[in-house]
Amino acid sequence: MSQTKICALFMFNHRFERNLPMIERLYGNRFSHRHILMPFATNPGPNISRVYELGRNFSGHIAQAARDFIREDFTHYVVIPDDLLLNPDINEKNIIERLNLREGEGYINNLIAADALRYSWPWAGEAAGTFGRSAQAIDLKGLLPPAEEAKVRFENMGIVFPSSPGPANFFKRIAAQPKAARTRWAYLYTLSLLGRKSPYPLLAGYSDFLVIPAPAIDRFAHYCGVMAALNIFAEIAVPTALALSTDRLKTELELNWHFVGSAAPRADPTGLKGVAFWKEEDFRPYAELLARPLDEMIATFPEDVLYLHPVKLSNYA
């Protein structure tokens, strides 16, 4: 692969400006080109973009800030949330090699048809309904590829779309969400779709760590903006936008698996693994590591782990 030039995009979902010195401390010597995307930033500047979306719609952050960070000399853009701790051995010189990415290849944790998750993950059904409703207010012609064209593109990547989204233990899942009113509402909204397919072939994927090759960045930012305008949840908006804009896409998990749960097989069992703390049992093996002082924690970071997420960097300030 030819010489790379990386732009690291640090994504904030909230105005946590007190974390900026920690970002500099952790990554200043590892990535020469850093850009901050922060909602309502107090002091925007050449390397800090002030953006205006809710965290659940962070695809809009990318679209709003694109003109600030896109440069012709960059070969890749790496998205790193402010609460994600990237393996300290990874830097701008080795990240593409460590991820074993081919020329022009992007990276995301996983990809699955959102309709396949319609009755097991609340935001899949919500996104299907929201897309149809929001699309009535936006003329999407020329803004997104036609639905059938996008579906064929995704199927050529290996994505499998269900013939008819159907419920499985649906009401038990709703009952298991007694305190999450928005989640219960999303499930009930899903039920109102009566098994109809999404009007657009949306994908779902864990979107907190991404690599976007430069040839795709303009299209990716544009599609992210369209999805934000449609009010599509980020972990559906971003993977859909990335798969629409990138011809080759590598995933950590096998295609057609969701990121929640430990049963999903990894596409490359010998590659680096991302660790997300969804439940207490996910966090427990790393509790001692994260309780150490920052320098000691960095020195003993597991070699086979790509990142830990989420991690409160303010704990190490």
Residue spans for each PLM region:
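Short loop->beta transition adjacent to catalytic acidic/histidine clusters or analogous donor-positioning motifs
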Residues: 2-7, 27-36, 48, 75
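Gly/Ser/Thr-rich loops at beta-strand to alpha-helix junctions
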Residues: 14-16, 80-86, 242
